[in-house]
A protein has these predicted regions:
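ATP-dependent carboxylate-amine ligase catalytic core
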Residues: 29, 34-37, 63-156, 172, ...
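Short functional linear segments
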Residues: 1-46, 53-66, 71, 107-114
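Membrane-proximal helix-turn-helix segments that form the acceptor-binding/catalytic region
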Residues: 182-191
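Extended acidic/charged loop-beta regions that coordinate divalent cations
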Residues: 74, 123-173, 205, 209-250
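Hydrophobic alpha-helical packing residues
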Residues: 57-62, 131, 380, 427
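C-terminal helical cap/extension that packs against the catalytic core
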Residues: 201-216, 304, 348-410
């Protein structure tokens, strides 16, 4: 197979396999030579902020001189984005070599009457092969869904576990309450391994403490009051962590969203907790935070154009918190879309209750999961936005929204990671 055929094969996997057990994933890893044992892992779970926290940690470790792998999901434009080595997306040849090894294993398993690896399992196995062959020191590993039964949990003996904010999402798989979902996320904890977690939700925090104590894990809880924001500009945020280790140290991050401060704080705390295993100077810590790059989360893709993959109640609440800061002085335009398994009605109502946009445009994404543009437009109208443009084609909708933004405004593109991916693809095509 060539690269394009390999990608097509992987994308077709969900059609002919089902969820496998962690024992199945462990057996696959064993037959691949246990590549995950050739590096140390920092395992990250949570509802929102996983990818950003992974990116902060990876950037700091790179600045400190360590070789790092980064495994995240989903991808926005190309599947290779899920695998980074030293903050660079892998090339097609590296992808194909790993795929061929995992495909050979998959064929052997099926011939033996066992199960083909799932879509996510296949990508995880490829990632472990890629990082082992690259000889990295550390891998920052983001869970796919949940934690307890997530395929990444088969990668045992992490250096630390990190759990970001917990909220209601993927309820059909993880549970109907924050506590139930937190229990699934806490499933990544390993006896004796330190865990650093977002403690802002009291129900989730209680579950984290209970699990950590039961497993004998040293645990570190962070809340918003443990941080102080000094300044927010169009270029980023300056904040400090109320921690005796860092005293008056101020950190700069290149993101405008307030919620990124908690993700950054979790990363800083993780580096601190691991200081005896992974020495990092204060200078490297500060520089790594300032240089962090992450796609699709309050990311500035063009001057004045921000894309954010907020797609659930917690994510939208955090988006609104950021937009509120800018609406006082800058006219705002919104490009919105959503997929049908998200609570887009409540998302829109939250946005409309607190933000007044100069112009609103809706579009549709997600293939068979798309929500018709007129349905989205009608919800905006019901929530007090009489003038809403409905444009099905994403490139046309983005072009219209960018024009409405004008020279003095800001354009926020929100509601779905699919929307973020399509917009980034549009921008990339224009640059070619």
């Amino acid at each position: 197979m060539n690269y394009e055929e390999a990608v097509a094969y992987i994308e077709d996997i969900p059609r002919f396999t089902t969820k496998n057990s962690l024992d199945h994933t462990r057996e696959c890893l064993r037959r691949l030579g246990d590549p995950q044992r050739k590096f140390r892992v920092i395992h990250v779970a949570g509802t929102n902020g996983k990818g950003s926290t992974c990116a902060f940690i990876t950037s700091v470790l790179r600045e400190a001189g360590y070789s790092c792998g980064l495994f995240t999901s989903p991808h926005l434009v190309e599947i290779n984005e899920r695998f980074q080595i030293n903050e660079e997306v892998i090339d097609d040849d590296t992808f194909l070599r790993a795929f061929e090894k995992v495909k050979k294993l998959s064929d052997e398993l099926v011939a033996e009457g066992s199960y083909h690896p799932t879509y996510f399992e296949t990508l995880l196995l490829m990632g472990m092969v890629i990082f082992a062959e690259a000889g990295v020191d550390y891998v920052t590993l983001e869970t796919g869904l949940g934690g307890r039964l997530d395929a990444t949990t088969a990668v045992e003996n992490p250096a630390a576990c990190v759990i970001t904010s917990i909220s209601l999402d993927h309820m059909q798989y993880l549970g109907n309450t924050v506590s139930e979902i937190a229990g699934e996320k806490a499933g990544i904890m390993v006896p004796g391994v330190p865990v650093i977690y977002d403690g802002n939700d009291p129900d989730a925090a209680g579950v984290m403490r209970e699990h950590a104590e039961k497993l004998g894990c040293p645990y570190y809880e962070l809340k918003r009051e443990d941080t102080e924001i000094h300044k927010i500009t169009k270029d980023g945020i300056r904040f400090s962590l109320k921690d005796k280790t860092y005293g008056d140290t101020v950190f700069d991050i290149p993101f405008i969203a307030r919620y990124q401060v908690m993700n950054a704080a979790l990363a800083v705390k993780t580096i601190q907790v691991l200081e005896n295993q992974i020495p990092v100077s204060l200078e490297a810590l500060k520089a790594g935070m300032a240089k962090t790059r992450w796609q699709g989360r309050m990311e500035t893709v063009l001057p004045g154009v921000i894309v954010d993959g907020a797609h659930n109640e917690d994510g939208v609440e955090k988006f609104v918190e950021t937009a509120e800061h800018f609406q006082k002085e800058i006219p705002l335009t919104l490009l919105f879309s959503a997929v049908d398994d998200k609570d887009y009605t409540d998302m829109i109502r939250t946005i409309c209750s607190r933000i007044r946009f100069r112009h609103v445009i809706v579009t549709q994404v997600g293939g068979y999961r798309k929500v018709p543009v007129e349905e989205l437009a009608e919800i905006f109208r019901e929530d007090g936005v009489p003038e809403v443009e409905a444009i099905e084609d994403v490139p046309a909708a983005f072009e219209r929204a960018a024009k409405e933004k004008g020279e003095d405004g800001m354009l926020f593109c929100v509601g779905s990671l699919y929307l973020v991916g399509e917009i980034k693809a549009v921008i990339r095509r224009k640059k070619l």
